[in-house]
Amino acid sequence: MNTDVLNQQKIEELSAEIGSDNVPVLLDIFLGEMDSYIGTLTELQGSEQLLYLKEISHALKSSAASFGADRLCERAIAIDKKAKANQLQEQGMETSEMLALLHITRDAYRSWTN
């Protein structure tokens, strides 16, 4: 497992809380969400892309934390904080950083589950 991206302890805690049989089901949903985020964030441009980045960053704060995706969670928190302070710009690096982390995190989970 890529410990730089995925927090094994949080995944084990989640498994203990909800049952190990439920983790693959919820993880599949989370992976699907990441695929959707990647696709939509890539397709949108300008202010629509920025608005979507704000939306997914807010959503990812909790879902990434629940699944032990610590780097993704940290980035989502930072972007959400900037969004609330109106400090995000259309040509900012946040979108490319979020896309890169979504890809890295999704791929790390897929290789972990295979």
UniProtKB/Swiss-Prot annotation:
Record-level Gene Ontology MF annotations: protein kinase activity
- Which Pfam families does the record associate with it? Hpt
Tell me what effect the entry lists for H58A. Constitutive luminescence
**UniProt modified residues of type Phosphohistidine:** H58
According to the UniProt entry, the coiled-coil residues are none
Q: Entry's InterPro entries?
A: HPT_dom_sf, QS_phosphorelay_intermediate, Sig_transdc_His_kin_Hpt_dom
- GO BP annotations, alphabetical order: phosphorelay signal transduction system
Q: Which residues form the HPt domain?
A: 19-114
Could you tell me the keywords of this UniProt record?
Phosphoprotein, Two-component regulatory system
UniProt function note: Phosphorelay protein which receives sensory signals from LuxN and LuxP and transmits them to LuxO, at low cell density. LuxN and LuxP transfer a phosphoryl group to LuxU on His-58 and this phosphoryl group is further transferred to LuxO. At high cell density, as LuxU could function to establish an equilibrium between the aspartyl-phosphate of LuxN and the aspartyl-phosphate of LuxO, LuxU transfers phosphate from LuxO to LuxN (and probably LuxP) and finally phosphate is drained from the system.
How does it associate, per the subunit comment?
Monomer.
Question: What name does the UniProt record give this protein?
Answer: Phosphorelay protein LuxU
| Lineage, top ranks | Bacteria, Pseudomonadati, Pseudomonadota, Gammaproteobacteria, Vibrionales
